[in-house]
């Protein structure tokens, strides 16, 4: 790492956070779930494509992720046709949740299972499955927290008009969301419209490493077409409008009767300057605006961040006055999926180049942080504290649900099940301590969900990383589940046990 890097000269804020964490760690044995606010929700999550399986059963048709994986683009050639096979094992999984003591289960509805062609006829078998899953959860006292769209766009809509790139997506998505409200809203009280709309446009339409594989040189190669300088912004705009449209329908027709809440879930990487240089500090601020502000600014203020307006220019879609009115305040809570910090340096020298994409527009270059250190995520729990502090100060302290937080390891040796994952318990405890401290300091966070309940297909790594509190034996036809030690640790905490002291960790 270069001289002057953050690892050598931490900011005063980080020093304070680290000292507070050290003090908290000394008293970690006193922290229980009852130290969190009354009504605080603890859970775990998955998504349909990642664990459901039954890809071609009971009327389900392909999503863009089915097409992508079957064309061999997923790491290791992984496909999710069976995955954890929750479609056939949901009762077993609900029993695992119940035994663990979860308050809630976050899952998604597969659009191509419920409405296989993306619009029109509802699949009765899909309707039956989700009704059964929801009823099973409620029977066991577990809240269903449901995501309406989690990346699995019906391939039929992609083929017909280009999917999210077309404004026609907004109408079809809204109709699909209303089917969900109408059929499940009497029991589902927590809705998420869209999962991570601030990353899907980058993976699918800038770098082209995810479906539908659209990009342009030099930002991506081997794509089926696309324009990395414009399409990510168009896709994000359509996702934002679709979200607002669904919320509008819910509030007009269903919320008062059904008594639920609705929000959106953003990927919450935290960007930190790589050095103490003024330019790097400015780069980190810009990147957080491009990453979180891309959606939070319209949701709170009705328009994209000024820094994006000035740097992206005419390539950033306009928000009309009527759309601004619909978007502003279109949430009852904000979901955040947080895993790590990313250190950035300024690369503003490239900003005037003719070929530009999202990262060139932001004027940053990533230089460490995010991702895996050897086998596991680097441990930077202070980054979650910074994210929550940022949401509190900049966006009016909205209600927040931590919808994903967790750590992964590599697959077990074939034929051997490894129950010992203390690294995961240590990771989760470190973040829970920071979360508790943030709440004490005024953060309006109301829930925390571990990613994930089960091992499953991961969008970035196939089956190369395992996030599950519960292991799934993918070599067994029955997809046998095994409870890992982290599940027992979480269960002990959820049932009133004290957080055990964790191994000392370095905050930077």
Swiss-Prot record:
Q: GO:BP terms for this protein?
A: carbohydrate metabolic process
> InterPro entries given for it?
Glyco_hydro_1, Glyco_hydro_1_N_CS, Glycoside_hydrolase_SF
Matching entries from Pfam families are given as: Glyco_hydro_1
What S-S linkages are listed for this chain?
215-223
- Its EC top class is hydrolase
Keywords from UniProt, A to Z, are: Disulfide bond, Glycoprotein, Glycosidase, Hydrolase, Signal
Q: Which residues bind a beta-D-glucoside?
A: 50, 150, 195-196, 339, 404, 451, 458-459, 467
Against PANTHER family, the record matches this protein to:
GLYCOSYL HYDROLASE (PTHR10353), INACTIVE BETA-GLUCOSIDASE 33-RELATED (PTHR10353:SF197)
Protein name listed in UniProt: Beta-glucosidase 32
Q: Which species expresses this protein natively?
A: Oryza sativa subsp. japonica (Rice)
- Chain's gene name: BGLU32
